């Protein structure tokens, strides 16, 4: 029976390399370093292929065949028979065996000395796949640094004793690590005794699909990954496994057809395509049948299916004999068949190591799990996988070299060519990480596989041709069933020769591998499968003709090689090799399918795991949230409870506090009641005390009121008495005023009567005197003609007597003619002067003989002379050249003055009035002291310009001019320094007494300064010149209205003297000098007629304001009140535009004070000779300066005229106009600010006009006096504008006329 067939145990036999008995059926080969020993089985004559005993197979792990190792076909002796019994063993070349045994012994000795592990030298089918890794063996399989080769057994032949000893020693060095080997029962028993039994793994239930622990789903360890892949395959169902297996056929066929589309359509290619498709169909069908048969084969032990045979490969004879009868008869292995030791334990360890290191690349997985996955078996140590060959090549470092060196020369050359073709580089440079051949074939779109199929089809076609050829040569060939071992073994000499040739070839291949690179042909490489270990014929086909792989047969032709192949391997064997090659590729592709499915499964599980973890996280988050909410609710409940407890505690405390508060309130009420009672008692006491105090206060108040009433009564009485006294006094004053008024009226009436009487008498007397004068003049005319001219040219006659009594009568030289001519008025032409004649003494006349209208001034002079003054000696009278007064304004004074002068004509020439004779001061000023000196031209009696005599001021009342309108500061008593040019100190309390010199033609005043040289006004003699007894009016231009004015009445219509000159003291009326007489009172009280009607309404208030301003200026002087002695200027004597008092009241033209040396107060003209500058003299610290200056006042009509003129000027210039639409530029609106600036420039002295003043003037109705026309105002862009519109009827030419009031005489006008 099959189960009783056991191989003879030969383990106890002594082993010797030279022993002929054990080595009869094998040939041993060793590489140079001795690490690998190759046992080549010799051809066996046995027809039946022995199968291993099921018992042995079940109890002992079968040895794995080396990758690419063909299934063992060596027959074993039947049960109970010895190896030597039965059929004769094939002959062995003893010489080769002996030589190889020596080499093996030598190599073993060297390996023992160097510590290297050697193989036992037993010929066996080596397996390249690693054992299934168990948890107990994981540490050994994964941690071993270098895998060692394991002994193999082939065809039931046991190894020699030396080999066994080496194996035992090697196993000790490896800590009990062993490799499966197929051999005899002895070898198997030996391995069973030495190997530790593997711990079984429980069979995975089909319900556990994933078989993967969720806790280790992310683990990428190689060992756990293998385990998970196994569990995944075992967990798959029947249909899932079939789908994974059968999908390969369609994919390969489809890829093959796509590849064949690019070939030509010739008959050969068509046959090739057909052969390829048939080959694939047949191979896949057989492959699926084998898989199905293997899966469905009953398990002898009841738990797992039968294990693989010694070869461990699909399609092997051992395997197929177990599951199905082979359709090919058993064949004798080729005499060139060898057993590779490259797939031993050493390669397995390297593969495990590589699988652990390269698992992340997902390129290779351990080959130990695929058989278990495919067959759903529990992984055991004796199971192998389908991919040992590919993974056996995946080694690193020198171990790969060792693996290659362990191959025979033709196999090693083929592997090098394949690797070079795959990686396009040398083998030595690809040791860092080499993929398997199957992986490369799969990753290169199956090109390698397709080429292999093409080679198989070509070989099939070649086999058919060979069969025909052999049939033609009378060879017995069965096309379908090849006879087993039909080829007889070659002669022993040929075998020996071939062995020697193989040895030489092997040596030469080793040298070539070590020394030079081997060139390969990719097409031939794909044709020869490395899994079959290669034979001589295949090795010859796999190498190119010129690659130097064979030293002796490199130049043989292809036909010779083919014949050699036919001799060395039967067709059955070649078909078996192709079939086995296909199975390897199909297994590799199936492995990739399983791996892809596993990866998809893992990815899905990982995704589910991620989703589950996310869901778990969500659940945990929800749990945490719920927990937090629960905790928060607990906290809220706890806080609520706490609040409730606090509320209860608070309520309790509030209750206690309320109780305490009630007690306190009760106590407080009790205390308040007691306090109230005490307060009431105290209040009653206070009330009684208050009543007593109130009574006392009322009593005192009544007493106080009584006293106050009495005081009021007394005060009222006193007030009544005071009022009565005041009333009495007022009545007395009123009565006195009435009486005084009545007396004044009486006096005025009497004075008027006397004045009328005197006037009448004066007229009569004047007529008489005129007649007498004309008579006398006719008599003396011839006598005084020559004298009058010289006298009149050299000696000016003074118009009045001397004003100083203390000065000596020293005559002063007369002014030269040139000086008199320089000051003469150009508008007063003089007639041809009469020649002066010798004066004739005349008898002085009495005062009673004088005219009744002689002024008191002259009378005082006469009376003064008669009072004890010595009269001057009589001299010849010189006619006085007198010019008429201006405009008849002073006709009355000038006539009386002329009469006064004529009254003194009886006195001789050269005599003067006595020094004691004093003239009344103007405006009622007191007489100056005798020793008072004045600057030249500023004497107390000098009249203002235009008024020609001292009698000018005698007609004004004294009380009107008690204070000077000019606020000059008085000089000190110590006579301070006079201004430059004056040189004479001035007495204290004196102002500027002398005025400017009179106009040309009027007599000049004498100087009061005895030592004063001739002044700027001409020669001023100390004593007055003797008055001429005869005077006549000088000839004048009758065209001039002023020259035609008579000396006396009738005078032209003009302003009354009372209005023009103010109050004047009457010299005609009796009384004291300077006091107003009756005539003056009547004149003042009488209404003004005539030219007074021509006065403007604003003139009189201006006069009052003028006097008021002068008083205020005087009051503004610091210090005690002092009276100024400076006489006021003549009315209209200077224009008010240069005056601090505003415009002139009557606009009388005449020289202003600035022309008389008043300095910077009235302008700055050049000072006359002898005066440095009155502006220096009238400085702030000078006694001649004004203490204050009143603000200037302007005449409103004149101001309106100036405003009109300003509007016309602006309209005529390029001033920007706001009303551009007006046709007439003079009627355009002008900004009020520009008009104001123009008005300010016209008043050089500085105006105080404001915009409101100008606007008020624009509202004044125009007339002939103020310029006429009317003003229009309008606002443009927020700015007020004004324009002047002239009247249609009125004449606007009056605007441009010179200043002056209506009725004022103007020099040069025709009146």
From Swiss-Prot:
The record, for CDD domains, names:
ATP-synt_Fo_b
Keyword flag Cytoplasm: yes
Quote the biased-composition stretches of kind Polar residues, using this chain's numbering.
46-58, 116-133, 960-975, 1026-1038
Biased-composition ranges for Pro residues?
A: 923-933
Locations of Low complexity compositional bias?
8-27, 68-86, 805-829, 891-922, 934-945, 1041-1052
Q: Which GO terms describe its cellular component?
A: cytoplasm
- Superkingdom, natural source: Eukaryota
Bilayer-crossing residues are none
Q: Where is this region: Disordered?
A: 1-226, 308-379, 478-521, 542-576, 613-1083
* Coiled-coil boundaries: 450-521, 599-795
**Residue ranges, compositional bias (Acidic residues):** 343-372, 491-518
UniProt feature, compositional bias: Gly residues? 984-994
* One Pfam family in the UniProt entry: NST1
What's in the keyword line of the UniProt record? Answer: Coiled coil, Cytoplasm, Stress response
Q: Where in the cell is it found?
A: Cytoplasm
Q: What does this gene product do?
A: May act as a negative regulator of salt tolerance.
Q: What is this protein called?
A: Stress response protein NST1
Q: Which gene encodes it?
A: NST1
């Amino acid at each position: 029976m099959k189960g009783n067939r056991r191989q003879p145990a030969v383990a106890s036999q002594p082993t010797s390399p030279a022993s002929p008995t054990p080595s009869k059926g094998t040939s041993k080969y060793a590489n140079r370093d001795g690490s690998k020993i190759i046992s080549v089985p010799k051809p066996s004559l046995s027809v039946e292929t022995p199968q291993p005993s099921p018992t042995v197979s079940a109890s002992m792990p079968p040895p794995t065949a080396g990758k690419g190792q063909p299934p063992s076909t060596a027959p074993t002796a039947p049960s109970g028979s010895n190896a030597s019994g039965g059929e004769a063993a094939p002959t062995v070349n003893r010489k080769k065996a002996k030589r190889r045994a020596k080499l093996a012994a030598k190599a073993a000795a060297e390996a023992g000395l160097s510590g290297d592990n050697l193989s036992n030298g037993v010929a066996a089918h080596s397996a390249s796949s690693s054992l299934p890794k168990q948890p107990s063996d994981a540490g050994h399989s994964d941690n071993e640094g270098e895998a060692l080769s394991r002994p193999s057994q082939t065809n039931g032949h046991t190894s020699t004793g030396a080999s066994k000893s080496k194996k035992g020693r090697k196993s000790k060095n490896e800590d009990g690590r062993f490799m499966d080997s197929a051999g005899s029962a002895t070898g198997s028993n030996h391995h069973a005794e030495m190997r530790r039994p593997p711990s079984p793994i429980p069979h995975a239930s089909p319900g556990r699909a994933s078989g993967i622990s969720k806790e280790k789903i992310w683990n990428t360890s190689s060992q756990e990954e293998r385990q998970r892949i196994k569990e995944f395959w075992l967990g798959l169902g029947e249909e899932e496994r079939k789908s994974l297996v059968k999908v390969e056929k369609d994919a390969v066929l489809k890829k093959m057809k796509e590849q064949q589309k690019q070939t030509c359509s010739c008959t050969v290619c068509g046959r090739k395509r057909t052969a390829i498709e048939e080959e694939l169909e047949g191979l896949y069908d057989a492959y699926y049948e084998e898989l199905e048969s293997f899966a469905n084969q009953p398990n002898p032990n009841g738990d797992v299916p039968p294990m693989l045979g010694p070869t461990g490969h699909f399609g092997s004879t051992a395997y197929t004999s177990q599951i199905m009868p082979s359709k090919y008869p058993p064949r004798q292995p080729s005499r060139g068949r060898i057993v590779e030791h490259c797939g031993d334990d050493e390669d397995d360890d390297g593969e495990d190591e590589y699988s652990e290191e390269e698992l992340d690349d997902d390129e290779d997985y351990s080959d130990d799990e695929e058989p278990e996955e495919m067959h759903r078996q529990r992984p055991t140590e004796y199971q192998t996988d389908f991919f040992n060959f590919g993974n056996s090549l995946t080694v690193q470092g020198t171990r790969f070299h060792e693996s290659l060196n362990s191959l025979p020369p033709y196999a090693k050359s083929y592997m090098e060519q394949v690797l070079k073709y795959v990686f396009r580089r040398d083998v030595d440079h690809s040791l860092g990480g080499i993929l398997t051949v199957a992986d490369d074939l799969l990753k290169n779109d199956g090109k390698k596989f397709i080429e292999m199929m093409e080679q198989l089809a070509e070989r099939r076609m070649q086999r058919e041709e060979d069969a025909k050829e052999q049939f033609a040569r009378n060879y017995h060939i069965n096309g379908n069933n090849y006879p087993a071992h039909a080829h007889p073994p070659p002669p022993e000499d040929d075998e020996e020769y071939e062995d020697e040739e193989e040895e030489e070839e092997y040596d030469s291949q080793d040298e070539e591998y070590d020394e030079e690179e081997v060139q390969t042909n990719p097409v031939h490489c794909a044709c020869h499968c490395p899994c079959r270990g290669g034979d001589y014929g295949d090795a010859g086909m796999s190498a190119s003709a010129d690659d130097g792989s064979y030293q002796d047969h490199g130049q043989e032709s292809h036909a010779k090689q083919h014949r050699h192949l036919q001799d060395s391997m039967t067709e059955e064997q070649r078909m078996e090799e192709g079939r086995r090659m296909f199975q390897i590729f199909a297994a590799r592709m199936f492995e990739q399918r399983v791996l892809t499915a596993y990866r998809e499964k893992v990815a899905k599980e990982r995704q589910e795991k991620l989703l589950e973890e996310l869901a778990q996280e969500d659940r945990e988050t929800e749990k945490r949230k719920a927990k937090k909410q629960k905790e928060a609710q607990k906290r809220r409940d706890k806080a609520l409870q706490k609040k409730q407890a606090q509320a209860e505690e608070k309520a309790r405390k509030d209750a206690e506090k309320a109780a305490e508060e009630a007690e306190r309130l009760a106590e407080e009420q009790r205390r308040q009641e007691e306090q109230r009672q005490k307060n009431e008692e105290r209040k009653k006491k206070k009330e009684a005390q208050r009543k007593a105090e109130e009574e006392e206060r009322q009593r005192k108040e009544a007493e106080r009121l009584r006293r106050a009433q009495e005081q009021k009564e007394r005060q009222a009485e006193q007030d009544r008495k005071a009022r009565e006294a005041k009333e009495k006094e007022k009545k007395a004053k009123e009565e006195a005023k009435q009486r005084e008024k009545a007396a004044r009226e009486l006096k005025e009436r009497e004075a008027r009567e006397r004045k009328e009487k005197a006037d009448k008498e004066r007229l009569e007397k004047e007529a008489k005197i005129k007649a007498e004068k004309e008579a006398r003049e006719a008599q003396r005319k011839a006598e005084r003609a020559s004298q009058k001219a010289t006298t009149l040219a050299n000696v000016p006659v003074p118009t009045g007597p001397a004003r100083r009594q203390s000065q000596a009568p020293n005559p002063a030289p007369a002014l030269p003619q040139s000086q008199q001519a320089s000051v003469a008025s150009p508008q007063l032409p003089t007639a041809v002067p009469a020649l002066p004649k010798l004066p004739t003494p005349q008898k002085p006349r009495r005062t009673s003989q004088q005219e009744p209208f002689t002024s008191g001034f002259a009378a005082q002079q006469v009376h003064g002379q008669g009072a004890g003054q010595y009269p001057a000696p009589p001299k010849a009278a010189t006619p006085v050249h007198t010019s008429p007064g201006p405009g008849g304004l002073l006709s009355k004074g000038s006539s009386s003055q002329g009469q006064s002068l004529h009254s003194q004509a009886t006195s001789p020439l050269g005599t003067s009035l006595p020094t004691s004779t004093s003239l009344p001061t103007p405006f009622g000023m007191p007489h100056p002291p005798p020793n008072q000196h004045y600057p030249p031209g500023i004497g107390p009696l000098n009249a203002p310009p235009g008024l020609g005599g001292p009698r000018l001021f005698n007609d004004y009342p004294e009380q009107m001019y008690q204070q000077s309108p000019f606020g000059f500061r008085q000089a000190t008593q110590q006579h301070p320094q006079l201004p430059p040019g004056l040189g004479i100190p001035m007495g204290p309390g004196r102002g500027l007494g002398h005025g400017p010199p009179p106009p040309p033609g009027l007599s000049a005043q004498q100087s009061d300064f005895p030592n004063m040289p001739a002044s700027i006004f001409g020669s001023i003699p100390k004593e007055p010149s003797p008055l001429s007894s005869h005077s006549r009016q000088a000839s004048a231009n009758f065209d001039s209205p002023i020259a035609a004015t008579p000396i006396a009445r009738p005078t032209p219509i003009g302003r009354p003297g009372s209005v023009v000159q103010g109050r004047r003291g009457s010299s005609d009326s009796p009384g004291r000098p300077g006091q107003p007489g009756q005539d003056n009172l009547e004149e003042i009280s009488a209404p003004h007629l005539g030219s007074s009607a021509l006065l403007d309404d604003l003139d009189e208030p201006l006069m009052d304001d003028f006097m008021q301003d002068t008083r205020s200026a005087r009051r503004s002087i610091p210090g005690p009140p002092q009276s100024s002695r400076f006489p006021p200027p003549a009315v209209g004597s200077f224009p008010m535009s240069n005056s601090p008092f505003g415009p002139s009241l009557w606009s009388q033209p005449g020289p202003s004070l600035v022309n008389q040396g008043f300095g910077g107060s009235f302008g700055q003209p050049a000072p006359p000779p002898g005066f440095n500058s009155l502006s220096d003299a009238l400085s702030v610290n000078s006694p001649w300066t004004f203490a204050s200056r009143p603000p200037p006042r302007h005449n409103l009509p004149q101001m309106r005229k100036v405003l009109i003129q300003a509007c016309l000027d602006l309209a005529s210039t390029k001033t920007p106009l706001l009303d551009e639409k007006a046709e007439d530029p003079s009627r355009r609106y002008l900004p009020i600010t520009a008009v104001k600036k123009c008005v300010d420039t016209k008043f050089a002295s500085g105006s105080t006009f404001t915009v409101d003043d100008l606007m008020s003037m624009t509202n004044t109705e125009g007339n002939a006096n103020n310029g006429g026309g009317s003003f229009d105002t309008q606002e443009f862009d927020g700015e007020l504008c004004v324009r002047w519109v002239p009247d249609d009827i009125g004449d606007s030419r009056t605007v441009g006329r010179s200043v002056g009031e209506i009725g004022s005489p103007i020099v040069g006008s025709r009146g």
